[in-house]
Amino acid sequence: MKALQFGAGNIGRGFIGKTLSESGFSVIFSDVNQNIVDAINYNREYFVKIIGSNQNKTVNIKRVSAINSNDSNIKKIISSVDLITTAVGPTALEKIALIITQGIIFKIKNQFTKPLNIIACENKIKSSSFLKQVVLKNLPIKYHDYLNKYIGFIDCSIDTIIPSINNKDDLFLTVEEFKEWIVNINQFKGAVPKIVDMKFSNNLDAFIERKLFTLNTGHAIAAYLGLIKNYKTIQDAISDKKIRVIVRSAMEESGSVLIKRYNFNKNDHLDYIEKIFLRFENPFLSDKLERIGRNPLQKLRREDRLIKPFLGAFEYNLPYSNLAKGIAAAFYYHNKNDLESIELSSSIKKQGLESTIIKICDLPVNSKEVYSIILEYNLIKKIIR
């Protein structure tokens, strides 16, 4: 069995590539970073340190190779593999779709009918379904029947934390023991691959939003609040009592949306929040706030980790003040090395805060949602001082 993994970063190597290799796949990584590509091809293996609650261990990931995403030979690889996975970030999916489209066309022209399943592992709800729509837009209509018959696009939810830690070995990664990979079993074409610890669900939306509204929401709010106070790591931010209360309360607010929407058991969900907090506090998984907070425009989109639960609270007439504080903190974020942060700051300066919120978050003009964010923005420094 062969798999092509787009993205050789932390999640790509530390979670997806590792899991696929342990499941018996030969894994080909595709990335635009030629240094990483060369390192993988030179070593043909890499090491991952797993941080557990009781003990740590290091595992050797073998059967790996790599190709640059711009290499024209990648279409041949796409036509021959059994599985494609991605971990490139939601904004890069459209570029990946163009590459996948060329591979599918090559597969069709060579009359290959072996089913191909594609799992986009991104922090975007139904990212594989989104990827499919982009591929269909680029694929000639005469090939659409082939795609619908032989190409599966499987939506999923992934949950794990892999911090960026400087190592002498560029390929070495430190990961947490906890991991979750849940997929929609109904979207596979052909035989369902046997992948270690992969779980199947017929109600994937609930799991996707549970992770997005809890891990991702809490992570982002802790980062943006912590950066206002010049903290460096997630542990530093969570150790601040005022920030801790806001983050925990925001996760409970987003949790109330989930409980209402999906009929989750309240006590079970509060236990899930507690587990997330313990993961944030793990000193062996120290993660930099600048990494967590990067790409604020993406994180402030209507369907992402901050605005979606916030709007859910309005939808069900539930508390939202701490979610609003987290969103306000995101508009404070400024990092001269982050292009999205620069664009965000420039928009606030030129267009004003209200217009920027309306545009980026896709919120109604003169709405309670917008004014609640502005209110918290004007108070945020006093609140966490």
UniProtKB/Swiss-Prot annotation:
Sites where the protein binds NAD(+): A3, L4, Q5, F6, G7, A8, G9, N10, I11, G12, R13, G14
Coiled coil: none
EC annotation from Swiss-Prot or TrEMBL: 1.1.1.17
Classification via Gene3D superfamilies: N-(1-d-carboxylethyl)-l-norvaline Dehydrogenase, domain 2 (1.10.1040.10), NAD(P)-binding Rossmann-like Domain (3.40.50.720)
GO MF assignments: mannitol-1-phosphate 5-dehydrogenase activity
Catalytic activity of the protein: D-mannitol 1-phosphate + NAD(+) = beta-D-fructose 6-phosphate + NADH + H(+)
Keywords in alphabetical order: NAD, Oxidoreductase
A GO CC annotation given for this chain: cytosol
BP term (GO), one: mannitol catabolic process
SUPFAM superfamilies in alphabetical order: 6-phosphogluconate dehydrogenase C-terminal domain-like, NAD(P)-binding Rossmann-fold domains
Top-level lineage group: Bacteria
Record-stated family: Belongs to the mannitol dehydrogenase family.
Protein name: Mannitol-1-phosphate 5-dehydrogenase
